[in-house]
Amino acid sequence: MDIFASHAFDWLVVLLLFGGAIYTLKIIGEEKTTFKEESYQVQFGNLVLEIPRWWTITEQDEHHIKFERTDTRYDWFATFSYFPDHQGKTMPELLEDKLNLENIEYDMDVVFETDSRVLFRDSEIQEQFQEVIRVEGKGSQDQIERIYYDIYLMRALNDHGYFIFESKSSVLNGSLEGPFFEESLACLSFIHETQTGKA
């Protein structure tokens, strides 16, 4: 009993951390079941994004939207960006430019996908975005910071521009928002006159 009494503060810290972990797991578990019911639509150009209700828009202009979790403190953000001119570069060249700009180097074991039929559910999106590259996995930024990075580069048929959609977090947080980012893009669709919910 003396051991517990002499380390009461230490035990209190352990119990608080344990309680916080259980609470976080409970919230995340609820989020996974409520994504479809409680997501909202955000208009981005001629696209409609399905966004989880717990993502907050922290930056927005005509060609860029940034989402963050303002209800938690963990290190994560997602950006959806459109660049009007690809300057004659191929998708692999654009990917290389982006990774060099951000000073990101992936580990060897990454997910790599170029088939729009695998990435998107909507048949119009699959047809229009036949040029797509997705890379997901762990890596390093600035040769120091360990990150989990998921990036989609997409170009529509007959479009001189291209999209970059990215999700970046610490390695430990990569599995928290990553599935929702992937689901958001899997649900990507074009705006139709009957759709509402613009942001």
Regions of interest found by a model, annotated:
Residues 1-32:
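N-terminal signal-anchor transmembrane alpha helix of single-pass membrane proteins
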Residues 2, 58-164, 173, 197:
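Conserved polar/disulfide-associated segments of primarily extracytoplasmic proteins
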Residues 21-41, 168, 194, 198:
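Short, compositionally biased strand/turn segments
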Residues 33-64:
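N-terminal "mature-domain start" segment
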Residues 50, 94-97, 183, 187:
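Long, highly charged amphipathic alpha-helices
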Residues 55, 159-199:
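Surface-exposed amphipathic alpha-helical segments
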